[in-house]
């Protein structure tokens, strides 16, 4: 819940000097990316910008405090300020910020700018007190913001120092409007106006000018002088002489003498107590100070000129001038030290009553009241956890004694989930084990079950499926039906374990159950996870179309719940890329993989390994070995600088081994084979993939017997577990083994099986990747004209893809080849006496490559009737009567020239 006063522009006060010269400068702010107002405290930055903002509608205001160094809090308020300026135009960003569904501030801002692209009128965003930001991540994100913000948006930053926002670059490009302390300082004329409206007896212009010079036009000093002159009999000039040369860090003594010592004791205590509040309203004041009619008291303080300002148009929220507020808080620690804990407790209670637990925690921490902090956490911690207030929760839990956590195991569980969310898996188990050792009777019942559900999640994340299964089953046995979150976790883990074991049907059912529960209780990240798992399972079973449809449901969920920036989004677009690649939709597959990299742009480069492997796979399917090599260099660098799950390593190894096969790099394959992991089992698609990598390397090295043993065992497992996509891949690799070993009939047999199975999987690129050896076999099958219709159609499609991406599109009948052919001593006399034209040679090459007449016409960009003429002519010159005879003739010519066909 956001505090309204932090998003309200300060109300323009009566008796303020209108800074006409500065307002004139600010009138052109819409021509700049950044308007920067910098000066020490008390120079009137906020007052000036509130005057400038008066009457503007398309403006958002965000007043910072120390707590805004938390990235999530900063994001929530900044987006809320933009929503304020645009009347709710950026709904997607607002939801993402509220639910913390973004990868980083920069990615959230990128989405913001997409939405703002449709907002065409001038827009202003004011951030006050930016000097309070010390978080380097926020600084970097705001630099990104300024670089990429729309042209019609102007950012207005108020700060006591020069912020780390790339100011020099903006200045050079004339995109910065600056107002500093020298310009903010009051002129003689402004000082005279100020005193005239503050003092009952006007002072002479010369006197006013001298006072202004004495304090260098410092607005706060002028305000103190006016206050002192009203409260005392001595002259304004005497106060000015005392203030001359004093700056904000040396004001304490003066403020004690001239302000606190000149108000009655009740007002003094009111000021000191209320100052602990970063913002205040009637209810807070009444509870903290003990005075009735808090609103009236605040208005009275405002009228006395005691540095109190309204924060919103309703007049409900107030705050002290930062300079005066800091002074009062320091004095409160000195003068009311004994009462201070009780004052903070009162503030915490009032904030809680108004529904602001994070503010209440701030005061409970300041009070050092562990019991109050514990009670707030017990009631609100999980809500704060679900809203990613992780830093605040961590600080709060550290402030509680261990005994308090033991007395409230829910807080131990919360601390463990915090650790899990930060991937500190070892610490989770240590914490839970310590708690179980020290908490009596916790080894049974609901809390123990919740511990086990979390432990199960940690175990599966850490690559221990057997332990994860044991713990998930224990949790589900003990958890009551109403403990939905832990039941969702345990069910999801159990489904993932069964997936790892290759029990796909049972795993699919559990993941569907997880999805149903997660949707019912709005646990969207587990709903998304379960859909991704379902898609992977369906892919493994060979039901790629159903996997596609499940992915569509996942994309719809992401759009509806604005989950675009969760890391799981990358997982989804990556498995979509794998499916598109299988279907030879390479451009779409590549685009999907690149979008996955974009999702992970704010994370460590190692996280991009899988998408990078997918890009390499696309290059390999196109036969683009130069590009594949370039990308492989980066992939191998990432492999050497990270620790990865075995599935990730297997996918990375796959593209490496295929590349070595295509380039004939036996040395690299042999070296890899000596060192690579050889899994104990092959009962899921991760392990099948690694063993397939091993078999491919063995085939490249001529170790056919070893490779055949591996592949036969893989096929046995794949058939028994119904891993149909793996079976399809295994058959293709077995085909290559038989072909290279000279076992042509066995090669044809398993190729026919692979083509038949591809009717279910839809595989294309898995055939294409095998290149010319696959093309030769498919040409022979097509020539035999015995394939069923579906297999015939698929074989022709695969052949077209190979011809497009591997070797030459026109077989080998280019100009150089034809010249060498005609000079060959064994060339048929018919060809020598009646030579084909260059175009007819091209047509012959395309016929040999399996192209139909329509496809040849499309390839050569001529009419189909023209192609028929070319075919008739070349048939006559070759002395053949039909297409199959032409293919056989071309094959003889290629063999004569030394090409293996």
Curated annotation (Swiss-Prot):
Transcription: is it a keyword of this entry? yes
* Any one GO molecular function term: DNA-binding transcription factor activity
Q: Which domain of life is it from?
A: Bacteria
- Decide whether keyword Amino-acid biosynthesis is in the record: no
Q: Where is the HTH luxR-type domain?
A: 829-894
- Family matches, as SUPFAM superfamilies: C-terminal effector domain of the bipartite response regulators, P-loop containing nucleoside triphosphate hydrolases, TPR-like
Which SMART domains does this entry report, sorted A to Z? HTH_LUXR (SM00421)
Q: Share an example GO biological-process annotation for this protein.
A: positive regulation of DNA-templated transcription
Q: DNA-binding region at which residues?
A: 853-872
Could you tell me which HAMAP family the record lists for this protein? HTH_type_MalT
Q: What does this protein do?
A: Positively regulates the transcription of the maltose regulon whose gene products are responsible for uptake and catabolism of malto-oligosaccharides. Specifically binds to the promoter region of its target genes, recognizing a short DNA motif called the MalT box.
Q: Which InterPro entries match?
A: P-loop_NTPase (IPR027417), Sig_transdc_resp-reg_C-effctor (IPR016032), TPR-like_helical_dom_sf (IPR011990), TPR_MalT (IPR041617), Tscrpt_reg_HTH_MalT (IPR023768), Tscrpt_reg_LuxR_C (IPR000792), WH-like_DNA-bd_sf (IPR036388)
Gene behind the chain? malT
Name of the protein in question:
HTH-type transcriptional regulator MalT
Tell me, what controls this protein's activity?
Activated by ATP and maltotriose, which are both required for DNA binding.
**Mind listing the UniProt keywords for this protein, alphabetically?**
Activator, ATP-binding, Carbohydrate metabolism, DNA-binding, Nucleotide-binding, Transcription, Transcription regulation
Subunit structure, interactors included: Monomer in solution. Oligomerizes to an active state in the presence of the positive effectors ATP and maltotriose.
Question: Member of which family?
Answer: Belongs to the MalT family.
Which residues of this UniProt protein bind ATP? 39-46
Query: Which NCBIfam families does the protein's record reference?
Result: PRK04841.1
